[in-house]
A protein has these predicted regions:
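Catalytic P-loop NTPase motifs of RecA-like helicase/translocase cores
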Residues: 1, 76-79, 98-102, 129-130
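Walker A/P-loop NTP-binding motif
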Residues: 3-18, 40, 109-111, 141-142
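Conserved Walker A/P-loop ATP-binding site and its immediately adjacent core
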Residues: 5, 18-41, 129-134
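Conserved P-loop NTPase motor "coupling/switch" region that bridges the ATPase
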Residues: 19, 48, 90, 107-190
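Conserved helix-turn-beta segment of the N-terminal RecA-like "Helicase ATP-binding" lobe
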Residues: 30-54, 142-145
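Conserved helix/coil segment N-terminal to the catalytic DExD/H
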Residues: 55-88
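Walker B catalytic acidic pair
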Residues: 94-95
Length: 190
C-alpha cells in the first residue's frame, strides 16, 4: 500500500514536470525487497538505483541520472554532502519513526538536507508509537511551524505531569498530534 501509493504519486508529479528526482530513505532491509521491486513493478519506465556500498559508489549513484535513488538511514550520513548537491525535489522517508528524536545526528542531517523547494513525505504506520511526544520529531520535519520550537513546549501540549518522572497523555493528545502532522494522509483498515 504505502510504497505503491508513493511511487504512483511521485511518478505523476514527474509526468507533470513538477519534480525530477526522488530520494527514498528507508531501512536497509527493505531497500530491495520493497522499494526496488515495487519501483520495477509500478514505474519500470523510470531510472532507479540503490545507493549502497562504499562511499564513492554511493556518491556516484547520487550524482547519476537516476530518477529514484534508494538509500538506507545510515547511508544518508555517509554521503549527506552529495545528497545536498544531488538536486532531489522529493525526499521520501519510509519508517519515519527513525526520525522521531530531533536530538539525534540522523534527524539533524535530514533537517539540513531540506531546502525550501524540497518536498518531504514521511511514511509510518505509528507516528506516536510509544507516546504522543514521539510525533514531535516527525512533525518538526514535516510541519516545523505547526509545533512549538522546543520539545518541552510540545510535551506540555500533549502530556500531563503526574510525578517528577511520570507523564501521561492528555485526553486530547491524539488530536494535537494529528494537527501537528498536517498535511497528512491517513489510511485505516476500516
Amino acid at each position: 500500500g504505502k510504497t505503491a501509493s508513493v511511487i504512483w504519486a511521485a511518478d505523476y508529479l514527474m509526468t507533470q514536470k513538477i519534480i525530477k528526482r526522488v530520494l527514498v530513505i528507508c531501512p536497509l532491509s527493505i531497500m530491495d525487497s520493497a522499494w526496488r521491486n515495487d519501483l520495477f513493478r509500478f514505474a519500470m519506465h523510470r531510472r532507479v538505483d540503490v545507493a549502497y556500498g562504499k562511499p564513492e559508489k554511493r556518491r556516484d549513484i547520487i550524482g547519476s541520472e537516476a530518477e529514484f535513488v534508494i538509500i538506507n538511514f545510515d547511508g544518508v550520513e555517509i554521503v549527506s554532502e552529495a545528497i545536498a548537491n544531488g538536486k532531489f525535489d522529493l525526499i521520501v522517508v519510509d519508517e519515519a519513526n527513525a526520525y522521531k528524536n530531533p536530538q539525534t545526528k540522523r534527524w539533524k542531517i535530514l533537517s539540513k538536507l531540506l531546502q525550501p523547494h524540497t518536498w518531504l513525505w514521511m511514511l509510518t504506520g505509528t507516528p506516536a508509537s510509544q507516546s504522543p511526544v514521539d510525533a514531535y520529531g516527525i512533525a518538526k520535519l514535516v510541519n516545523p511551524d505547526g509545533v512549538p520550537r522546543f520539545y518541552g513546549g510540545f510535551r506540555d501540549q500533549v502530556m500531563n505531569k503526574v510525578t517528577q518522572f511520570k507523564w501521561v497523555p492528555k485526553p486530547d493528545a491524539n488530536n494535537t498530534v494529528h494537527k501537528a502532522l498536517q498535511p497528512a494522509i491517513r489510511f485505516t483498515k476500516e
